[in-house]
Amino acid sequence: LICIDGGRVDRAKNSSIIQNFRKENSIFFSQSITYAPYTNSALHALISGAYGNRTGCNSYWHSREFNHNKFKTIVDYLHENNYYTCADVPTNLIMPKQNYDEYYVSDESSIDLKTHHYELLCKMKKLVDSKQKIFLHLHYSGIHEGIRDTVLKKFTNYSKEFFENRKQNEERYDALFTDAEKYLEYIHEKLDELNLWENSIIIVFSDHGMSLGEKFGERAYGALCYESTINTFYSYFSSDLKHKEITSQVRSVDFMPTILEHLGIKLDTNFEPLDGVSLFPLINDQNPKENFAYTETGNPLDSKIPPKKPNTKSIRTSEWKLIVNEHNDTKELYDLKNDPLEENNLINTGLEIESILWEEFLKIQEKSVIN
């Protein structure tokens, strides 16, 4: 797994580096909805295949509340199946340490991340050559750190100066994204050099997107549930796949069961069922039904820190989205097909889809645990 922290899907679509990342055997998912528009809950949902409202990791504050007694992660499954597991992350809050053989916390501002990740790839190569199966998570946080230093430390979610300078915001982000592309290009070269493509599943993805000032009230990510931060990308490589782009809506929680099916590993029925489903019916053009995608986050509003429980939530299909703002008891309904910028709120206009989405929203709330 190679995470590009804060990578926007629109930039990924237009990136020759990402689009050509072993393109002939890669499937590009261009509408993958994250459970949370911030890293720790997003990644916990990815590796467990379950939403944080059920696992316990539903806010910035609750990484340690992830319920390992009821939910297994992909790392747990792989460790049980004799994979050597290794991760490199910017903080130990974004990924549980359980069942990792090696777990590194790296500050990108103080080390050469490319060199460090190359060293890890070399270590994995030695294991592979000795017939040891491996799992490696690499985390590129350059975009996040750049936005942290130039946006989060300088502006608030209500700074007019930020929202009135969209061009500057775009240029700032694009410079950071270009650096991420250079990192990926380097990793691609090293995977070639080490011959690590064969018999591998390699996924390049973003945990969440990034606001560039599209919606007042969110200067980066983690406050709202609009497309700029919750719509992400996944590029899924395996030599037994043929290239295609899948534009249908999928969810980040779908990739854990997809990987397990690909590896022939069965789900453990002694644990809670997943929210995610395998994407192979979709990959194999079997026209499966579309699943609702759920996202939630904690809008800090006027506070300098996020709340300890989510207060902004959304439920959606590929064409419609219902946003529930619990902090002020309001709702928003958007026709994503005809209003992709989410500018025309259709709530309380008598549309049947509103009640359908609301019923699904309530079903998900009933499953929530209380931290």
Report each predicted region and the residues it spans.
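Catalytic domains that recognize anionic headgroups
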Residues: L1-N371
